Swiss-Prot record:
Classification of source organism: Bacteria, Pseudomonadati, Pseudomonadota, Alphaproteobacteria, Rickettsiales
Any single GO BP term: cell division
Gene designation per UniProt: murG
Molecular function GO labels: UDP-N-acetyl-D-glucosamine:N-acetylmuramoyl-L-alanyl-D-glutamyl-meso-2,6-diaminopimelyl-D-alanyl-D-alanine-diphosphoundecaprenol 4-beta-N-acetylglucosaminlytransferase activity; undecaprenyldiphospho-muramoylpentapeptide beta-N-acetylglucosaminyltransferase activity
The name this protein goes by in its record: UDP-N-acetylglucosamine--N-acetylmuramyl-(pentapeptide) pyrophosphoryl-undecaprenol N-acetylglucosamine transferase
Chemical reaction(s) catalysed: di-trans,octa-cis-undecaprenyl diphospho-N-acetyl-alpha-D-muramoyl-L-alanyl-D-glutamyl-meso-2,6-diaminopimeloyl-D-alanyl-D-alanine + UDP-N-acetyl-alpha-D-glucosamine = di-trans,octa-cis-undecaprenyl diphospho-[N-acetyl-alpha-D-glucosaminyl-(1->4)]-N-acetyl-alpha-D-muramoyl-L-alanyl-D-glutamyl-meso-2,6-diaminopimeloyl-D-alanyl-D-alanine + UDP + H(+)
Pfam families for this protein: Glyco_tran_28_C (PF04101), Glyco_transf_28 (PF03033)
Pathway note: Cell wall biogenesis; peptidoglycan biosynthesis
Entry keywords, A to Z: Cell cycle, Cell division, Cell inner membrane, Cell membrane, Cell shape, Cell wall biogenesis/degradation, Glycosyltransferase, Membrane, Peptidoglycan synthesis, Transferase
Naturally occurring in which organism (per UniProt): Rickettsia prowazekii (strain Madrid E)
């Protein structure tokens, strides 16, 4: 059986799309090895049929610390990849792929890179000259060298299996959430301890906002959004609102106090183990604009207000969100220019003009691709034909 190596790490946003690709390749009869770093070790599930290898490559701002570690990891990568005897290596960008990709070049093994963002990252830009193909999630990639344009293949984003399973649900804001979601399923979705949780919740008049900001910028979300909701409810006191929000434990008490006084239902979590459950009942998402988030929302057609993380590498989150906004598939509010008043007005505008949400949902679905399938096809066409 032919062997393929995937290389991804650093964050779950790189790790999970690579896993989804690996699962598709295994279905096609390949043996899949996955090289990742210590940060992603926590995501590895023993039920996965992928063979994992952990390399210790950390990000250092000091080049004199980084180079010795890179050299050691490069030698380990050469030994590992040589022993695996793979046919191709797929890199997903980010610093953890540097040593294995250099090793692949040294061993003359074909490489394909996947760029999840609308802005070609530094690592992928460097390896683009050595890659057979560059698979992309977007049709318009910024920071792309002229020589690399002929290598571009639009495969779309790669989405986790549990999100792909939502494909049978169709977004409809007029029916509260996804049209095939029954009241029983809706009730079972939520923690029974959620404030205000009862059978009335499935009423179509309730508008649900799902808010998640990841570990970076959590403080902003915990302060900005409750203030915006307070303004929103003052402007529209009859609004039946439900909030599902990611928030750190030390922020939850203060936010609960605000929401309780506004008489709205709410649910909090530091981390959502299966985010598909929250997607199911949301009318609108407020989130950062990381590649995985955008890919998942695109796949199920769930509209969002994006607040890009300003410190993201190469400001790629802004470019991701702006591309969707330019295609009327979402809304981009920059953190440096946002205020609670502006956010409240945007939410109210969408609630008052729900056709905007329906249109954005359809525009998202128009961009949807089966990325795990298309990239697998590209690998086979490029390497094995």
């Amino acid at each position: 059986m032919k062997k393929i190596i995937l290389v991804a790490g650093g964050t779950g946003g790189h790790f999970f799309p690579a896993v989804a690709l690996g699962e598709e390749l295994i279905k096609r009869g390949y043996i899949v090895h996955f090289i990742t770093d210590l940060r992603c070790k926590k995501y590895i599930n023993k039920d996965m049929k992928i063979i994992f290898h952990i390399l210790n490559l950390k990000r250092f701002s000091n080049i004199f610390l980084f180079l010795p570690i890179l050299s050691i990891t490069f030698l380990k990568s050469i030994r590992l990849i040589y022993n695996i005897k793979c046919c191709v290596i797929i890199g997903f960008g980010g610093y953890p792929v540097i040593a294995p990709m250099f090793a692949a070049i040294f061993l003359r093994i074909p490489i394909i890179i996947h760029e999840q963002n609308s802005y070609l990252g530094k690592v992928n830009k460097f390896f683009a000259r050595f890659a057979k193909k560059i698979a992309t999630s977007y049709e318009d990639i910024k920071n792309l060298p002229e020589f690399a344009k002929s290598k571009i293949v639009l495969t779309g984003g790669i989405v986790r299996k549990n999100i792909r399973e939502l494909d049978s649900f169709m977004y409809s804001v007029s029916q509260h959430s996804l049209t095939k979601l029954t009241q029983t399923a809706l009730t079972n979705t939520f923690n029974p301890l959620v404030k205000g949780r009862n059978d009335e919740f499935a009423n179509s008049n309730i508008f649900t906002i799902f808010i998640f900001g990841g570990s970076q910028g959590a403080k902003l979300f915990s302060e900005l959004i409750p203030a915006s909701i307070k303004i929103l409810m003052k402007k529209q006191p009859s609004l039946e609102l439900n909030i599902i929000q990611q928030a750190a434990l030390d922020h939850q008490v203060k936010i609960k106090d605000i929401y309780s006084k506004l008489n709205i239902t709410y649910e909090f979590a530091e981390f959502f183990d299966n985010i598909a459950l929250q997607y199911k009942v949301a009318n609108l998402v407020i989130s950062r604009a990381g590649a995985s988030t955008i890919e998942e929302l695109t796949y199920i057609g769930l509209p969002a207000i994006f607040i890009p993380l300003p410190s993201a590498a190469d400001n790629h989150q802004y470019y991701n969100a702006k591309l969707l906004e330019d295609n009327k598939a979402g809304w981009c509010l920059e953190q440096n220019n946002i205020s609670s008043e502006k956010l409240a007005d945007k939410i109210l505008d969408l609630i008052s003009n729900r056709q905007l949400l329906e249109d954005a949902s359809q525009n998202l679905l128009n961009r949807k691709k089966e990325g795990h399938v298309l990239l697998s096809n590209l690998i086979e066409d490029t390497v094995f034909l």
